[in-house]
């Protein structure tokens, strides 16, 4: 009997230590998830958002440093206040949304991982793809694990949330976005932000 109890205790401990990571889905039916972008040139400041966010992330609350996943933004979902400017932005010279319908970041390695409570900060290295060009980038991220909070965002559903916040910049010319444009009018630096929450339903 004692041996049996010891075995059960070991199984319980082992299952806790090696618990499988959870998969979080970032396709938000509420349409709240968004990516932001800004090109702040001396003559014109272009600011916009994109709501067509999807993707999945594998996250283990017991081992946040092992996080992997891919976040995708639909190019056609990018919006700016000026409709003519938006038309140019989605056209062939800029993002060529018809030919390159997705912008993505695939996380591959987490470094400098620090966790306090349910919040983890880290530098994540991954592949950023824009207009068919892929480059390796390292960006700072903040992950907040919210156990049993899915119902607070989606009433009637049970599960957990993973909130991701990130901000980084890229060079427009590195991705063949409107090359040759006067930088006094269109900044070569594109500042990007990500404000999203993914669901892991139970």
Question: Which residues does each predicted region cover?
Answer:
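Low-complexity, acidic/polar, glycine-enriched regions of mature
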Residues: 19-202
């Amino acid at each position: 009997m004692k041996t049996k109890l010891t075995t059960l205790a070991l199984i319980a401990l082992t299952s806790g230590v090696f618990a499988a990571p959870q998969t979080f889905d970032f396709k938000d039916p509420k349409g709240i998830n968004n990516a932001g972008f800004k090109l702040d040139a001396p003559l014109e400041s272009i600011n916009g958002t994109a709501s067509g966010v999807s993707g999945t992330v594998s996250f283990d609350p017991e081992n946040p440093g092992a996080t992997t996943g891919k976040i995708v933004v639909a190019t056609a979902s990018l919006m700016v206040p000026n409709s003519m400017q938006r038309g140019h932005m989605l056209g062939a010279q800029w993002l060529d949304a018809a030919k390159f319908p997705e912008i993505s970041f695939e996380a591959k390695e987490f470094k400098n991982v620090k966790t306090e409570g349910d919040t983890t900060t880290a530098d994540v290295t991954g592949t950023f793809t824009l207009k068919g060009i892929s480059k390796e980038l390292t960006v700072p991220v903040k992950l907040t694990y919210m156990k049993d909070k899915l119902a607070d965002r989606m009433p009637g559903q049970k599960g957990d949330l993973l909130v991701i916040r990130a901000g980084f910049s890229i060079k427009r010319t590195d991705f063949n976005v409107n090359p040759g444009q006067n930088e006094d009018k269109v900044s070569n630096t594109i500042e990007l932000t990500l404000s999203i929450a993914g669901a892991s339903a139970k």
